């Protein structure tokens, strides 16, 4: 299994082959990486230009956006993952990316920026365009979440602090991406009703994910106040469901593999929890008010937590590999890989740096040759023989 982990402290990343629990020889007691090397190096890289997000481009390149809104491209087929292209855009100075989305079929990538803008960059013949196109998002407020619709290229959703959910269309797609003269607003959400004290409920969206839907846009948002909200544009402008799943800020939101009926969330402490979106506990959240007494709210059923290995800090990087594994990393500098279904930890490695993002490299697993398989079987048979020949302990005579 091959992973690349972006590091906050160095501005680069670390990549390696990792051993899973079921692959550990019998004479060893804990999993460890086969090898770890520094990759995604950029000569000027520093904590001030650290990698925030990384994604694959046509399985050949890794595209990374950095804290200073610069973009780096690396060749994954090169043993050292060499730098192919790096661009710094004057137009984006002072902006921080909140997400990165690659459209490989149209040779383009889009970054959402915290300033309430989006940047479109072309990528042709292994080279990033020298200039990017800036799009001002409706609302004119800062954003913290910016998500692309997987089924409709050019459609995005965004939101932030006191900036409620909007779905917009930014560009048309043909052979190339063509920006619209003005951004078209497809949906603008309304806030939930006032709380039990008749006070306005604050808005602070941290993450957004599109849910597969045929006749409408369906989304789920996470908030700084520990809420999960589900929107259906056919249902109306207010959330179809509003759930209080925790009391801490939710900082990551991911589907559990290909299953969009379950999500994995992390907060700013050490929680990594898996919730169902279809099975609801009607009385799971309970609080008390001096004016109205007990307040009971429904919550998506908690299916379990990924806590083996002792998380001791906020988790910023979460990545699922197909329907098999989920990897996590954050402030405590440990990379942990879990079995997605059983939640058992299969690998834990100290990376020596705070982790921002995790990238699984698909298609890079080398198949074992017949000789390697035969050698492994011989080794296992040898260990079995040694175990069987070990003399039994004599019982003490009384």
Curated annotation (Swiss-Prot):
It is found in: Nucleus, Nucleolus. One of its GO terms (cellular component) is nucleolus. GO terms for biological process: ribosomal large subunit biogenesis; rRNA processing. The keyword Oxidoreductase does not apply. Keywords: Nucleus, Ribosome biogenesis, rRNA processing. Residues 364-379 have a biased composition (Acidic residues). It comes from the Eukaryota. The keyword Nucleus applies. Coiled coil: none annotated. Residues 364-398 are annotated as: Disordered. Its main location: nucleus. InterPro entries: WD40/YVTN_repeat-like_dom_sf (IPR015943), WD40_repeat_dom_sf (IPR036322), WDR74/Nsa1 (IPR037379). Component of the pre-66S ribosomal particle. Involved in the biogenesis of the 60S ribosomal subunit. Belongs to the NSA1 family. This is Ribosome biogenesis protein NSA1. It comes from Meyerozyma guilliermondii (strain ATCC 6260 / CBS 566 / DSM 6381 / JCM 1539 / NBRC 10279 / NRRL Y-324). The gene is NSA1.
């Amino acid at each position: 299994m091959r992973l690349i982990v972006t590091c906050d402290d160095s501005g680069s990343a670390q990549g390696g082959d990792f051993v899973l629990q079921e692959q550990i020889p019998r004479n060893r007691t804990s999993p460890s990486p086969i090898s770890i090397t520094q990759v995604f190096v950029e000569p000027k890289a520093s904590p001030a230009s650290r990698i925030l997000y990384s994604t694959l481009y046509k399985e050949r390149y890794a595209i990374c956006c950095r804290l200073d809104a610069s973009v780096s491209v690396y060749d994954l087929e090169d043993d050292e993952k060499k730098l192919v292209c790096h661009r710094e855009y004057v137009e984006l100075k002072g902006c921080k990316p909140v997400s990165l989305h690659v459209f490989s079929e149209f040779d383009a990538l889009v970054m959402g920026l915290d300033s309430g803008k989006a940047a479109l960059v072309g990528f042709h013949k292994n080279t990033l365009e020298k200039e990017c196109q800036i799009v001002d998002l409706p609302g004119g407020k800062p954003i913290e979440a910016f998500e692309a619709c997987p089924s409709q290229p050019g459609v995005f959703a965004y939101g932030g602090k006191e900036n409620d959910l909007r779905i917009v269309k930014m560009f048309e797609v043909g052979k190339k991406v063509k920006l619209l003269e003005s951004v078209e607003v497809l949906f603008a959400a309304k806030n939930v009703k006032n709380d039990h004290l008749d006070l306005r409920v604050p808005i602070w969206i941290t993450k957004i994910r599109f849910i597969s839907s045929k006749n409408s846009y369906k989304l789920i948002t996470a908030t700084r106040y520990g809420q999960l909200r589900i929107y259906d544009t056919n249902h109306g402008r207010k959330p179809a469901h509003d759930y209080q799943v925790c009391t801490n800020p939710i900082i990551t939101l991911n589907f559990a593999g290909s299953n969009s009926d379950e999500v994995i969330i992390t907060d700013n402490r050490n929680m990594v929890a898996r919730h169902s979106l279809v099975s609801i506990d009607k009385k799971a959240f309970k609080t008390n008010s001096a004016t109205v007494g007990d307040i009971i709210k429904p919550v998506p059923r908690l299916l379990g937590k990924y806590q083996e290995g002792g998380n001791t800090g906020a988790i910023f990087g979460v990545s699922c590999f197909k329907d098999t594994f989920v990897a996590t990393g954050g402030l405590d500098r440990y990379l942990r890989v879990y079995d997605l279904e059983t939640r058992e930890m299969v690998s834990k490695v100290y990376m020596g740096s705070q982790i921002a993002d995790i990238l699984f490299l698909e298609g890079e697993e080398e198949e074992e040759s017949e000789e390697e398989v035969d050698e492994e079987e011989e080794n296992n048979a040898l260990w079995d023989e040694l175990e069987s020949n070990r003399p039994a302990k004599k019982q003490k005579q009384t």
